[in-house]
């Protein structure tokens, strides 16, 4: 059989009979203690405890193994570590590869908690962090130090949505520091719209809380690694006590089955909203990777197979507190909430100085209020009507 379509892989991955045991979905195996019938069975389990066999609940159960196998098939990895949330996935994956005296490079458009982990935790451990512009490309070579151990990407960038020239960055890192680990927060692409490991990235990290679970009712993080990094990542996660419960692992596997159709709708609807916003007289610019003119659009077009529902736009004016309240408090379909990736549409606002505070060594090139949207699965014309009504409140 020729290579399967992504939609088929999403439905089939991790569903072998050893995990489903006669049902359609993988079984939910809740267990701390796993019983051995013989001394020899216990010896074998102990010997193979790092190889995906039943040993102890913290190493995983059939429910976890099913999800991990699916993630490896989807992202092309040698192994997948599971974490209680996306922030834990980022923090523990970084910790697995650094020690006192090391240096890491992180994009200055990374998710705020990822930045905070570097400045507030790693700094105490004697690990220094340098920051780079998301559009740096091959210029990153100039920032690599002899002790640079990790280069951390996030594409698109948080809030302002810049897309990296990943091949240029990775090539520069491999030439200048071949032993350095390249990892990426790949949450926006859900691990499937951008196949990170195919671009010679070592580890693809996700807040699977977002699109994989897909219903805003669970929290989990994943890190899919290549063979070079897998043993070290796996053992560090185990020693740090990182795990998720079987029910959340099951919910993630279940969410994966509909990921393809959901992402297509997110792409279609978000792009239609972005194109409408780009023509609106109150909007200065739209930051949507699939929209021509968005920063790094050419790299999205070359390297990605689609877009998700998260993007932002900048108003021509800065809203004052009263205008912000009038604008945000009265939407019918858009809710104010952190996170994203579920079926519902969300909205948040940030002033330019708030964004600037999240850009170490960088600046913002706009003065109006930035609005971040997550376009859900509602009818797109209804969503546009809701946004249009919002603009009427701030004219």
Model region roles, listed by residue range:
Residues 15-17, 30-36, 188-190, 210, ...:
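Glycine-rich beta-alpha junction loops
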Residues 2, 10-19, 80-280, 287, ...:
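Conserved PLP-enzyme active-site core in the AAT-like
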Residues 119-120, 128, 149, 176, ...:
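PLP-dependent enzyme catalytic core of the Aspartate aminotransferase-like
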Residues 1-61, 69, 371:
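N-terminal "arm"/small-domain region of PLP-dependent enzymes with the aminotransferase-like
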Residues 38-88, 113-120:
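Conserved N-terminal alpha-helix of the aminotransferase class I/II PLP-enzyme fold
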Residues 224, 312-314, 374-376:
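Short hydrophobic/aromatic beta-strand micro-patches
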């Amino acid at each position: 059989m020729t290579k399967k379509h992504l939609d088929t892989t999403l439905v089939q991955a991790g569903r072998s009979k050893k995990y489903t045991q006669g049902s359609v979905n993988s079984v939910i195996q809740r267990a701390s203690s796993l019983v051995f019938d013989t001394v020899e069975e216990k010896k074998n389990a102990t010997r193979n405890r790092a190889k995906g066999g039943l040993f102890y609940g913290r190493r995983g159960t059939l429910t976890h193994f099913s999800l991990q196998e699916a993630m490896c098939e989807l992202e092309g990895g040698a192994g997948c570590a599971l974490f209680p949330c996306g922030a834990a996935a980022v923090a523990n994956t970084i910790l697995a590869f650094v020690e006192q005296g090391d240096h890491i490079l992180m994009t200055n458009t990374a998710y705020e908690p990822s930045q905070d982990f570097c400045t507030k935790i790693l700094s105490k451990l004697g690990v220094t962090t340098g920051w780079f512009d998301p559009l740096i490309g091959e210029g990153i070579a100039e920032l690599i130090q002899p002790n640079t151990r990790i280069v951390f990407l996030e594409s698109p960038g948080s809030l302002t949505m810049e897309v990296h020239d990943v091949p240029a960055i990775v090539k520069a890192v491999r030439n200048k520091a071949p032993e350095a680990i390249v990892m990426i927060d790949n949450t926006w692409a859900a691990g499937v719209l951008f196949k990170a490991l195919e671009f010679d990235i070592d580890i693809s990290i996700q807040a699977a809380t977002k699109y994989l679970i897909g219903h805003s009712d669970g929290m989990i993080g994943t890190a899919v690694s290549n063979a070079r990094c897998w043993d070290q990542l796996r053992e560090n996660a185990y020693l740090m006590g990182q795990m998720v419960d079987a029910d959340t692992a099951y919910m993630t596997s279940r969410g994966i089955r509909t990921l393809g159709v959901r992402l297509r709708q997110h792409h279609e609807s978000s792009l239609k909203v972005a194109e409408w916003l780009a023509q609106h007289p109150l909007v200065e610019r739209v930051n949507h990777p699939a929209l021509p003119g968005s920063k790094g659009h050419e790299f999205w077009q070359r390297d990605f197979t689609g877009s998700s529902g998260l993007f932002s736009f900048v108003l021509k004016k800065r809203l004052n507190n009263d205008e912000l309240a009038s604008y945000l408090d009265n939407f019918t379909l858009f809710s104010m909430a952190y996170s994203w990736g579920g079926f519902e549409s969300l909205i948040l606002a940030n002033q330019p100085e708030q964004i600037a505070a999240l850009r170490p060594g960088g600046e913002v090139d706009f003065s109006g209020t930035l609005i971040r949207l997550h376009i859900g699965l509602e009818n797109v014309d209804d969503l546009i009507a809701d946004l249009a009504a919002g603009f009427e409140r701030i004219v």
